[in-house]
Amino acid sequence: MNGLNALNMRQEPKRGAKLAEKLKCEKSSIHYLSILNGNTRGLVWTDDPTAPRLAVVYSYLLGGFQIMGTPLQTAEEYAAFRLFFENKVFPLAKDEFELSEFAYSADTEALSDMMRVVFFDKELFEQKQLVYRTAEEYSAAEMPFIHAAEGRPMRIRRASESFLRENAEFAGAYLPEILESYKSFADFLKHGFAFFVLEGENICGNIISNGEYNGCCIVGADTKAEYRRRGIASALLRTAIEFARERGNEIIWECAEENIPSVRTAESCGMHRCGEFFVRWFEFEPNTPQD
């Protein structure tokens, strides 16, 4: 293989278990494996749909990219890969997805080193992410106490068709986020789950799964600012752990190393740290006005 034809990255519309199996490694992100598997929405480019050596995976939910596979070998391949980003990925990211920066992670250190060479002229920023997993020795524990205001009890409710009909805030504020990862709400209920803490009908906090692969579910949680420091996130995470365990699944929790409350939430629910990775990004240069 010579010249720019040494690497022909193309969009891969047909995703499935075989593609995920061929590209995964020990440190692969569950969220991006779920995209490769076809359970979660995203875009995939590979160098070869039948025997992929390299893949670039885009997440609609995260607005970021994952680099998977094995590193490039030749200068021609590096040049072709950079042109692939310049000619295909960057215009799509800026014009269609309206992104102001290009953010990515890589499955391995070798791929991270490769990307530094590919973007040798970019000013890269980075943030360390920690990965937590349900501990094997985890056992059901008493549900953490939620510190509700006097006379304003809180309850936890699972997302369902009836919840969608009954709670306008869920339908208006949270359903759109879910549909960034799943093609329909029915598809979400088939492959994912969500729990919400309610004060009356007001949603105080949530935990939503955004990918599943090989029995592992990755979740993201958020608590409204005025309800923080009340044990809501821990209660939601423990609820998700119990829900997953009943179905023979495990929970994956990712957070920035500097996000101490999120780290403490994972540890308070008996999760153990099983890995780490870096998110790196650079800002797009503003478009030059055309005469």
What does each model-found stretch correspond to?
Residues 133-144, 268, 272, 276-291:
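Terminal substrate-recognition subdomain of acyl/acetyltransferases
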Residues 75-88, 229-242, 264, 268:
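Conserved acetyl-CoA-binding loop-helix of GNAT-fold acetyltransferases
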Residues 181-216, 220-224:
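A conserved beta-strand-loop-helix scaffold within acyl/acetyltransferase catalytic domains
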Residues 41-43, 48, 52-164:
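Acyl-donor-binding surface of acyltransferase catalytic domains
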